[in-house]
């Protein structure tokens, strides 16, 4: 039965990315003997980025984002590929990814291809602070390059994991910057001995501006252990009574 299914697939089925070309070339059927070569070719042909390498932090974030996608179980890949990617992450083996390449609706094709290139033992990686041939780093860590099967070249290269990873890192940076900005603002107002009306909850609630209300709330938290403002608030409460 299995042999019959394989024979039927080879002779009758046309599945995009498995036995067809990619994009505008999807109209062309790929010969059975070239199916594996097709998957290697999509990786190698798209590993054409230019410019400086992405920082290791961005690369690691992209690898984690790609791993998360694989763990959904819908990419059509072998578990060995996932396991190798996990080892790369844990050992801080970072694929060399040039900063310039395709990014957009079709996915981070160039950037992800550079990740895929290292998983098959080719290209270069940053390891222990140095740019080294992937094959040498794999040998040092007793790892074997992954042997691509049908569809896996497409599965690894097609996605938006790089822009997602970079976006997550920048979101974390933005949150940190926001907290530092709020802290600095509170300190400046403390030094200037300014009134605390600008953080008044009733006053900010009247504005109906959620962003303003949130910042005022954050500032009140920072000011909660300020002797100056705590004393001022106590005086206001006493006057109100």
Where do the language-model regions lie?
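Polyanion/phosphate-binding surface patch
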Residues: 8-13, 28, 211, 215-216
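Glycine-rich loop at the start of a catalytic domain that most often binds anionic cofactors/ligands
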Residues: 24-38
């Amino acid at each position: 039965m299995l042999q019959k299914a394989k024979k039927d697939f080879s002779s009758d089925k046309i599945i995009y990315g498995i036995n067809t070309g990619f994009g505008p070339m999807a109209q062309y059927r790929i010969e059975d003997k070239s199916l594996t070569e097709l998957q290697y070719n999509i990786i190698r042909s798209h590993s054409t980025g230019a410019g400086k390498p992405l920082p290791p932090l961005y690369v690691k974030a992209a690898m984690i984002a790609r791993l998360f996608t694989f763990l959904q179980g819908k990419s059509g890949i072998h578990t060995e590929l996932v396991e190798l990617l996990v080892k790369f992450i844990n050992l801080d083996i970072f694929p060399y990814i040039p900063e310039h390449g395709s990014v957009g609706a079709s996915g981070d094709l160039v950037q992800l291809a550079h990740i895929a290139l290292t998983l098959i033992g080719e290209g270069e990686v940053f390891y222990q602070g140095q740019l080294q041939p992937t094959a040498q780093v794999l040998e040092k860590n007793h790892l074997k390059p992954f042997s691509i099967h049908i569809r896996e070249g497409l599965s690894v290269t097609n996605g938006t994991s790089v822009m997602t990873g970079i976006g997550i890192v920048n979101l974390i940076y933005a949150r940190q910057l926001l907290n530092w900005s709020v802290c600095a603002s509170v300190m400046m107002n403390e030094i200037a001995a300014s009134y605390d009306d600008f953080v008044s909850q009733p006053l900010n609630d009247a504005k109906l501006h959620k962003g303003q209300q949130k910042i005022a709330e954050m500032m009140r938290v920072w000011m909660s252990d300020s002797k100056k403002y705590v004393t001022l608030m106590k005086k206001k409460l006493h006057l109100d009574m």
